[in-house]
Curated annotation (Swiss-Prot):
Gene giving rise to this polypeptide: SLC39A13
Functional summary from the UniProt entry: Functions as a zinc transporter transporting Zn(2+) from the Golgi apparatus to the cytosol and thus influences the zinc level at least in areas of the cytosol. May regulate beige adipocyte differentiation.
Membrane topology listed for this record: Multi-pass membrane protein
PANTHER family recorded: ZINC TRANSPORTER SLC39A7 HISTIDINE-RICH MEMBRANE PROTEIN KE4, ZINC TRANSPORTER ZIP13
Molecular function terms from GO: protein homodimerization activity; zinc ion transmembrane transporter activity
Descriptive protein name: Zinc transporter ZIP13
Species of origin: Homo sapiens
């Protein structure tokens, strides 16, 4: 440019114009790409919403809705088996259990319960856990040493968990009436009523103040039953996912297997300090675990129509079953067996041993002819 003192100033103008035009073109392209990006994002969100709606639609479709209803009803029937012991155990909490005859009848039931617990662990829960682990192995091969060790570790974890819970929560004592001991309750009542006593003396000393002790072992047994019912819900729902016929057969098999088991659990709750109706209500509350298990099995079912239990449900059952086994072993060997070892009469000890074997034999028969 003439008159400009700076060398090369003539080239600065065209360069400036070129850069300005390039910047404007980039801005126009960016502005034009924003609608495309927005449309792509909208399309992706729509696809995700469609997939979610399709999954919920498949989960609540007509065929799957029948599976939901049948599975929940089957799991509820298994949970309602907890009221069966009310029909076969004529024991009441109170004076009858404190009598010698009532205590002996309870020990007989506990002997049967011990055999049922051991049979349930070694003939039902652990074999089922091994079966789930084998089915989860790649290629359908057998269990590896590491998988077997994991099952053993889960059993130990169940035992230690129940031990820690019993250490943490000490036995709670509920006193119906807390009074200072008085040698002559009639005289005390007369003093409070101006010298006139209208109360009759108790027929038996010691019945005026009722002290009821609820042991932690009862709550631990309820926890183990809830987890056990969760696995039953998994099995019932997985069977109904295959067909209604297999689902009904599985439900009936679990019901037949649970009846002697519920009788033993009922005896353990009576031993822990619950009365008959409280024990029955708490047994019914464990049915919630079965409903949760059935819902979990159906919700984790593969949407591609693969029958049977989903991999997530199989993996859950593979550790829940041995963990529950450890809990039942702890209850049987730590809470029930010591009471039976206190018996010194040889004839009664033999009866307890025979009842223990009877509980195991019942579980063997159900495992052979039902499962």
């Amino acid at each position: 440019m003439p008159g400009c003192p700076c060398p090369g100033c003539g080239m600065a103008g065209p360069r400036l114009l070129f850069l300005t035009a390039l910047a404007l073109e980039l801005l126009e392209r960016a502005g034009g790409s924003q609608p495309a990006l927005r449309s792509r994002g909208t399309a992706t969100a729509c696809r995700l919403d469609n997939k979610e709606s399709e999954s919920w639609g498949a989960l609540l479709s007509g065929e799957r809705l029948d599976t939901w209803i049948c599975s929940l009803l089957g799991s509820l029937m298994v949970g309602l088996s907890g009221v069966f012991p009310l029909l076969v155990i004529p024991l009441e909490m109170g004076t009858m259990l404190r009598s010698e005859a009532g205590a002996w009848r309870l020990k007989q039931l506990l002997s049967f319960a011990l055999g049922g617990l051991l049979g349930n662990v070694f003939l039902h829960l652990l074999p089922e856990a091994w079966a789930y682990t084998c089915s989860a192995s790649p290629g359908g091969e057998g269990q590896s040493l590491q998988q077997q060790q994991q099952l053993g570790l889960w059993v130990i974890a169940g035992i230690l968990t129940f031990l820690a819970l019993e250490k943490m929560f000490l036995d709670s004592k509920e006193e119906g009436t807390s009074q200072a001991p008085n040698k002559d309750p009639t005289a005390a009542a007369a003093a409070l009523n101006g010298g006139h006593c209208l109360a009759q003396p108790a027929a038996e000393p010691g019945l005026g103040a009722v002290v009821r002790s609820i042991k932690v072992s009862g709550y631990l047994n309820l926890l183990a039953n809830t987890i056990d019912n969760f696995t039953h819900g998994l099995a019932v729902a997985a069977s109904f996912l295959v067909s209604k016929k297999i689902g009904l057969l599985t439900t009936m098999a679990i019901l037949l297997h649970e009846i002697p088991h519920e009788v033993g659990d009922f005896a353990i709750l009576l031993r822990a300090g619950f009365d008959r109706w409280s024990a029955a209500k708490l047994q019914l509350s464990t049915a919630l675990g079965g409903l949760l298990g059935a819902g979990f099995a159906i919700c984790t079912q593969s949407p591609k129509g693969v029958v049977g239990c989903s991999p997530a449900a199989e993996e859950t059952a593979a550790w829940v079953l041995p963990f529950t086994s450890g809990g039942f072993l702890y209850i049987a060997l730590v809470n029930v067996l010591p009471d039976l070892l206190e018996e010194e009469d040889p004839w009664r000890s033999l009866q307890q041993l025979l009842l223990l074997c009877a509980g195991i034999v019942v579980m063997v028969l159900f495992s052979l002819f039902v499962d």
